Amino acid sequence: VTLSMNGTNNTLNVDQEGTAGNTVTHVSFWGSMSSYGGDINGNDNNVKIKQTITTGTDTNRVGFHIMSSDNNVDICQGGTFSSSSDTTCSDSGVAEYGGHTINLDLHSGNNDIRMGQETGSGNADHYAQIYTYGGENNDVFTKQSGNGNKNLYMTIRTDGGEQSLTQRGDGVHTATIDLKGSYHTDLSLT
């Protein structure tokens, strides 16, 4: 699915299931960016993306550039969340092993972002790259769980906000976090 979304108070739900190639993005992550207005542009939007592979061929990808404020974005690849007030992305079904990639670029404030990457079997990796620039009080909750390597790269260039990151079980764990801003940013890494 390749898309751009403009406007205020939109709701977008994408649910992808299958054995290969689940992708929600604009072309090559930073494709058009809708003339730099962002792939998602407009305030107060609710975006929910759920990707499930049922005995993998290693592809779950999500990539967006968001230029607007006060959005709720939930990205669930295979399963997880459980907290920053979960909106039920549990799962942990048998035989789910997609390779999970999230690339998210926020140039805005007051966004609530929840991301989950889980592999129930197999040895697929998890990769998340998150940037927040300009705008304040972005809250990000990320959980990577089970099998394969877990790589998380986060750059926070905003004031305030809470960042909660969890990497669990199996494989090598790497988290690179770069924080900069005038006011506090709460960070929890487990």
Which positions does each model-derived feature cover?
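Low-complexity repeat regions of mature extracellularly deployed or surface/particle-associated proteins
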Residues: 1-190
